[in-house]
Amino acid sequence: MDLYEYQGRDLFERHGLPVLAGGVATTPEEARAIAERLGGRVVVKAQVKVGGRGKAGGVKLAEGADETVARATDILGMDIKGHTVHKVMITVTADVAEEYYFSYLLDRANRTFLCIASVAGGMDIEQVAAETPEKVVKAPIDANTGVDAAMARQIITRAGFPAEVVDQAVEVAVDLWKAFVAEDATLVEVNPLARTGQGGLLLLDAKVSLDENAAFRHPDHEALVDQAAVDPLEQAAKEKDLNYVKLDGEVGIIGNGAGLVMSTLDVVAYAGERHGGVKPANFLDIGGGASAAVMANGLEIVLSDPSVKSVFVNVFGGITACDAVANGIVQALALLEQRGEKVTRPLVVRLDGNNAEAGRAILDGANNPLIQRVDTMDGAAERAAELAAAGV
């Protein structure tokens, strides 16, 4: 789960890291109250989970409460790369002398944690690494030992931080690691980590991602979810314990197993190129226990998306045999009818694996005109794309 900047700032503050005084506002009136509390010159920053806010006009300076209200009014409601601004963060300004970069992240490729540090802060770190790689230090972190003062000093020194800030930077690095671990984060990034004219260090930006798989250890993280940005179908699927992600397409996808579903997305996208460019409408993994109730819930979620014109059910029978899945599909359609959900869009079903022949026979015997059985994955994807294109 990616946090907004103000949420990351608050998280850093809770862990004792030096951040700017500020607050978050959803209305110009709230912005006025924050500006009056802070006093003097402030920065008004759009809260969206994309970069490029400054170039889009989403970051503005303001002097006094009236100007802060005007800036907040301009920014609230803006569209920045498809994201509507619902909140602004308002902080005091800082007298910045130098800018550095510091982050910890989960390095999935190497199955470890990674620290990245640079004296070239305030810029895109990937650009810095590409153009001046000598300015970027990358240090693997052993999860068993973590980051203590000695290791932090080694990283900070290698990165070339000025001698006068090394001690402070070491303290920040250690505390930031503690926050990273305590919150089960997959990324904490500070860009820039600034040295002020008075010589102190401040974390002027906060980019934080939390591991949703560790949410059971952090009931407080639930409050960080932006309900206004949550897709209602994804929320409904979550409540039914379904792994669903909405996409921008016309072919609904239901499969058992994340790997199979990902492959299904690929073959449908490829087939769709030959049928008007139709695309997968979602990712939905119903897991191994494809009971009638689970299948009905899955179909209900997928068919609740008005952009879906056809549904591709792709199942490889393993522990759950294909005949059980086929019965689940037939019963699911009947169950949806009982719920008052009139199903009119076609289902293309491909079954393979354990008891596939028996499952196919069940589908054929159901004589349901909505069910079209295709026995190959490519053929089923082709048919689903064709039906979706015809229904668009």
Swiss-Prot record:
Source organism of the structure: Salinispora arenicola (strain CNS-205)
Needed co-factor(s): Mg(2+)
Subunit structure: Heterotetramer of two alpha and two beta subunits.
Note on how the cofactor is bound: Binds 1 Mg(2+) ion per subunit.
GO biological process: succinyl-CoA metabolic process; tricarboxylic acid cycle
Substrates-to-products reaction catalysed: succinate + ATP + CoA = succinyl-CoA + ADP + phosphate; GTP + succinate + CoA = succinyl-CoA + GDP + phosphate
Record-linked HAMAP family: Succ_CoA_beta (MF_00558)
Cellular component, GO annotation: cytosol; succinate-CoA ligase complex
Keywords: ATP-binding, Ligase, Magnesium, Metal-binding, Nucleotide-binding, Tricarboxylic acid cycle
Domain ATP-grasp: 9-236
SUPFAM superfamilies linked to this entry: Glutathione synthetase ATP-binding domain-like (SSF56059), Succinyl-CoA synthetase domains (SSF52210)
One of the record's GO molecular function terms: succinate-CoA ligase (ADP-forming) activity
Keyword Repressor in record: no
PANTHER family: SUCCINATE--COA LIGASE [GDP-FORMING] SUBUNIT BETA, MITOCHONDRIAL (PTHR11815:SF10), SUCCINYL-COA SYNTHETASE BETA CHAIN (PTHR11815)
The UniProt record lists the keyword Metal-binding: yes
Family: Belongs to the succinate/malate CoA ligase beta subunit family.
Pathway(s) of this molecule: Carbohydrate metabolism; tricarboxylic acid cycle; succinate from succinyl-CoA (ligase route): step 1/1
E.C. no: 6.2.1.5
Residues binding ATP: K45, G52, R53, G54, A94, E99
Any one Pfam family match given in the protein's UniProt record, by short name: ATP-grasp_2
Binding site for Mg(2+): N191, D205
Record protein name field: Succinate--CoA ligase [ADP-forming] subunit beta
